[in-house]
Amino acid sequence: MKSLSPIHETCVGEQFEAITIADFYANINLYPCKNKLKIKAREKIRVCYLIFLMSEKLSKQYKDEWRDKILKLLDIDESYYKSKYKEPVSDFPSDSNQKFAKEMESIFR
């Protein structure tokens, strides 16, 4: 749970609606949980980037399966994900995407 704590601190209230650290942990680890993780309005692209970064930390054996299940949990279409997940680090990111990418870089380095 320790490695998810900075993500929870940074993203809950910004990219995700309010949720406890325990429920956040359960959702991210695909455990059954009555409180579903919900993306805030206009944050789906940044969540796609976060999913990408998190999936890169997983072994190849689990990466695709976890990504597919978390996309389904968050109601993100795979084609949308594939077209948007790199936007925060594209050649011309928006200011908010650029800020988010820098915050995530400090967490994931």
What residue ranges belong to the model's regions?
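Flexible coil/loop and intrinsically disordered linker positions at secondary-structure junctions
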Residues: 1-109
